[in-house]
A protein has these predicted regions:
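Intracellular loop-helix junctions on the cytosolic face of multi-pass helical membrane proteins
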Residues: 1-4, 154, 158-284, 288-294, ...
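Short amphipathic helix-loop junctions that connect adjacent transmembrane helices
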Residues: 25-41, 279-305
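Central cavity-lining transmembrane alpha-helices of secondary-active solute carriers
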Residues: 47-64, 308-321, 417
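Conserved MFS/SLC helix-loop-helix module at the cytosolic interface between two early adjacent transmembrane helices
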Residues: 57-94
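Cytoplasmic membrane-interface "Motif A"-like loop-to-helix N-cap segments
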Residues: 66-79, 327-346
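C-terminal ends and interior cores of transmembrane alpha-helices
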Residues: 79-95, 343-365
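Intracellular juxtamembrane helix-capping segments at the cytosolic ends
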Residues: 113-127, 386-399
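Glycine-rich segments within core transmembrane alpha-helices of 12-TM secondary carriers
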Residues: 133-152, 158, 173-177, 181, ...
Length: 492
C-alpha cells in the first residue's frame, strides 16, 4: 500500500500545507496593517486568495490532460509557489501593493495547476482503487500537519522576522517540495499516464506558456479590482460547468448519468465550502476583534492563528473517519457520498450554533475564550475531512477516464465559487477603518449573521439526504445501461 513514491508526494503535500497556509494566516494582518486595507477589502482579498487558486484548477486540469501531464504540471506548480512567495518577500520589504498582489496571483495560479494534478498522480502510486480511497484521508491529514504548524507558528514568527521573513520561509518550503519532485522524477513518471512519459512538443510548450501568462495576468487584475474580479470568478465557474454539461450531453447514457451525479455532488460541495470559507474571512475577523487569552491558560495563540485549530482537528479526524467508515463497511453498512456530506452539514450546524451562542452572549469585555473557537473548529474540521476526502474519491470513481482531471477540477470550482460567495457574505459584518468594536456590534451584527448560517446549515442537511437518494437511483440506472450495452454486444 505505502511506497517511496506516495510517501515522497505526501512530503510535498506537507510542504504545501506549511507554506501556503502559513502565508494565508498572515495575509489578513499584512493587508490590514502594512498595506492599510480596510476590513471589507481585506476579507475579499484573503477570501479570493483561498478561492481563485482552486478556480484555475479548470485550466490546470486542461493543461494536465492535454499538454503536460500530471507530473510536469505538479512540478511547475511548486516552482510557481516558490516564485510567488519570493515576490511577496519583495512586496513586503518595499511595502509595494502591486508586487504583493502579483505574488499571490502567481501562487494562486500554481495552486490551480496543483489541485487536479496531485490527486490524479497520487492515485497512480497505489495498486488498487481501494488502497487509494483508504489512504487519501491520511494524505489529507498530512496536509493538515503542515497547515497546523504554518497557521500556528507564522503569526508568532512574523513578530520576530517581519512579514517578509515569513514569506521567505514559505518560498524555501515550496522550493523543498520542488526538489523532492525532481528527486523522485523517474519513479513518478513511470507510474504516470502516457502523456507524462512522452516528450512535450514545442507547440504545446508555447501554448502552455501563453495560457499561463494570460491566466496570471487575469488573476492579478482580479486581485486589483475585486468588484470586477468576483464576477469573473462567477463567469469562469459557470462556463466550466456549462462545458461539463455539454460533454455530458454528448456521452453515452451510462456516462451521462454518472457525470450528472458529479454535478449534484459539486453543488453540495459548493454549499459546504461557503461555510469552510468563513474560517479565512468572517471567523478570522471575529477572532482578531474578540479572542483573547491563552488556550487552556498556558498555550499562546495569536487571534489570527485561531484557524490553526482547524488543521489540528483535521489531522485527528482523518484516521478516525477512515476507521469508522472502514468498520461500517466490514459490517456491510454503506453510506453514499452525498449522505456523508449530509453528516458534514450536521457537524457544520453544530459548529456555527456554538459560534452564534458565543457572540450573542458576549459580555461587556467583548472577550471570547480560545476554547470556544477550539470547540467550533472540532465540528467544522470533521465535516471538512469528510467532504474534502470523500468527494474527490467519488468523482474519480465515476468520471470517464478521458476527462478525469477536468472532472476533479470541478471540486476546485466548487471551492472557488464558494470562497468568493462566502467572502461577499462576510463583508456584511466588516467594520469601517477605525470603527470601534462594541458589545452591541458583536451581539447583533455578528450574532444575526452566524444565526442565519446555522439555520441554512440545517436546511442543507435535508437537501443532502434527498440528493443521496437521487444519486443512488442515477448510478443504478447507469449500471443497468452498461449491462444492456454489454448484453447487446454479446448477442451481436
Amino acid at each position: 500500500m505505502w511506497n517511496r513514491l506516495n510517501k515522497s508526494m505526501m512530503f510535498c503535500q506537507m510542504m504545501f500545507g506549511l507554506s501556503f497556509y502559513g502565508v494565508m494566516v498572515i495575509l489578513t494582518r499584512f493587508f490590514l496593517e502594512d498595506l492599510n486595507y480596510n476590513e471589507a477589502d481585506t476579507m475579499m482579498v484573503v477570501g479570493a486568495f483561498s478561492a481563485i487558486g482552486p478556480l484555475f484548477a479548470i485550466a490546470g486540469g486542461f493543461i494536465a490532460d492535454k499538454f503536460l501531464g500530471a507530473y510536469r504540471s505538479l512540478t511547475i506548480a511548486f516552482l510557481g509557489f516558490a516564485s510567488g512567495y519570493a515576490l511577496l518577500v519583495l512586496g513586503a520589504a518595499a511595502t509595494n501593493v502591486p508586487m504583493a498582489l502579483c505574488g499571490i496571483a502567481l501562487a494562486s495560479y500554481a495552486r490551480g495547476l496543483m489541485s487536479p494534478s496531485y490527486p490524479s498522480l497520487y492515485k497512480r502510486t497505489f495498486k488498487t482503487q481501494e488502497d487509494f480511497e483508504n489512504c487519501y484521508p491520511i494524505n489529507y491529514s498530512v496536509n493538515n500537519i503542515g497547515a497546523l504548524l504554518g497557521q500556528y507558528l507564522f503569526p508568532m514568527l512574523v513578530l520576530v522576522v517581519g512579514f517578509h521573513g515569513g514569506f521567505l520561509l514559505s518560498a524555501a518550503l515550496a522550493g523543498a517540495a520542488l526538489l523532492m519532485m525532481l528527486f523522485v522524477r523517474k519513479g513518478l513518471v513511470e507510474a504516470s499516464a502516457e502523456i507524462d512519459q512522452k516528450p512535450v512538443s514545442t507547440k504545446h510548450w508555447g501554448a502552455f506558456l501563453g495560457l499561463s501568462s494570460a491566466m496570471i495576468g487575469l488573476v492579478f487584475f482580479m486581485f486589483s479590482n475585486m468588484d470586477i474580479g468576483q464576477n469573473i470568478v462567477y463567469a469562469i465557474g459557470g462556463a466550466a460547468i456549462i462545458y461539463f454539461v455539454s460533454l455530458m450531453m454528448k456521452s453515452k447514457k451510462s456516462d451521462m448519468l454518472k457525470m450528472g451525479t458529479i454535478l449534484i455532488i459539486t453543488f453540495l460541495t459548493t454549499c459546504f465550502f461557503v461555510y469552510y470559507g468563513q474560517m479565512m474571512t468572517s471567523m478570522t475577523m471575529v477572532a482578531i476583534n474578540t479572542m483573547r487569552g491563552d488556550l487552556f491558560g498556558f498555550i499562546p495563540v495569536a487571534p489570527e492563528a485561531s484557524m490553526a485549530m482547524n488543521p489540528l482537528w483535521c489531522m485527528v479526524a482523518g484516521p478516525i473517519i477512515t476507521g469508522i467508515f472502514s468498520k461500517l463497511e466490514k459490517k456491510n453498512i454503506h453510506f453514499s457520498t452525498a449522505t456523508k456530506v449530509g453528516f458534514s452539514f450536521i457537524l457544520t450546524a453544530i459548529a456555527f450554533g456554538i459560534l452564534t451562542m458565543a457572540v450573542t452572549t458576549v459580555g461587556e469585555d467583548i472577550l471570547i475564550r480560545p476554547e470556544v473557537f477550539l470547540a467550533i473548529h472540532f465540528f467544522l474540521a470533521f465535516g471538512e475531512v469528510i467532504v474534502g476526502s470523500m468527494v474527490v474519491a467519488f468523482i474519480l470513481s465515476v468520471a470517464p477516464k478521458h476527462i478525469e482531471n477536468f472532472s476533479v477540477s470541478l471540486f476546485s470550482v466548487a471551492i472557488a465559487l464558494s470562497g468568493i460567495v462566502g467572502a461577499v457574505f462576510s463583508t456584511s459584518i466588516a467594520l469601517e477603518k477605525g470603527q470601534e468594536i462594541t458589545q452591541e456590534i458583536v451581539q447583533t451584527v455578528y450574532g444575526d449573521y452566524f444565526q442565519l448560517l446555522t439555520i441554512l446549515a440545517v436546511v442543507m442537511v435535508g437537501i443532502a439526504m434527498a440528493a443521496s437518494f437521487i444519486i443512488r437511483k442515477m448510478l443504478e440506472a447507469a449500471k443497468a445501461a452498461e449491462e444492456t450495452i454489454e448484453l447487446e454486444q454479446a448477442n451481436s
